Amino acid sequence: MCELLGMSANVPTDICFSFAGLIRRGGQTAHHADGWGIAFYEGKGCRAFHDPAPSARSEVAQFVRGYPIRSRVVVSHIRRANRGRVGLENTHPFTRELWGRAWTFAHNGQLRGVKRWPLGPYRPVGTTDSEHAFCWLLEQLRARWDRRPSDAPLRREVGRLAARLAELGVFNMLLTDGHSLFCFCGSKLAWITRRAPFGPATLVDEDLTADFSTLTTPDDVVSVVATRPLTRDETWTVMTPGSMVTFQDGVPQTEARHRPSDQAGRSGKLGPGRRRDGGPRRSGRPGSAGSPGGSISRLAPLKDGAL
């Protein structure tokens, strides 16, 4: 399968160190050799690089590795194709507009039958099941709210929709609007939060060490999420399948386990003329999938501090 990398920080931070470890897995230390991509948020803007070449041999990847683009939210992906041809249009992450913000999505896994789920205005450019799932997810959010809701209900709804998609197979997801970084674990995902006192770390995939005490200030908070831990001498938190952690300004929110609230009709359709909140569906909006809310069992709050 593919591999994911995400970052959330409270100050603009470069991801060169973690990205150096990830791209080695794109055809050198692992077989994810069917393209790669990375997206950096700079204010409301989103700067993205994609290449269908293996990241370990990509000149574009080497440029990104050596150019310290500073961002508070980053999403990256290296691909091992299983749905859709190897091509630029099928490289993650994918980006679309919702509520006046650029939303970015990357996925690891396979989703059987997701292309039978109907879509509205959002349409895939490529042929992956991942991009179809992204379009479907954004349509459900757009159908429910005219503008971005507050953080807590948005977290619950993203988690519920991710759990519905996870019913179709393997669904590990990074999703962001540049403010929140939603990380859903279907099978494998790990994260680490770095904050003062900072220390050194060494990559698993390359003999490269960074001393974060020389690269940060005492107030910095940086969280990194990856399919597999990227460093060998730090303690990473391995997520439980079916759980989601949301990061804001580098700080992990309470981890929650999600399951879809409805079991009827996995096509993503509602009954005619109904919205998920029970009211009439707005004219011209895409259909919704599921009934109000979701069932979420809370786990203990995650501990802050250097890991």
Regions found by a protein language model. Name each.
Residues G113-K115, L119-R144:
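Glycine-rich phosphate-binding loop plus the immediately following alpha-helix
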Residues P52-V64, I78-G100, W117-G120:
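Short acidic (Asp/Glu) patches
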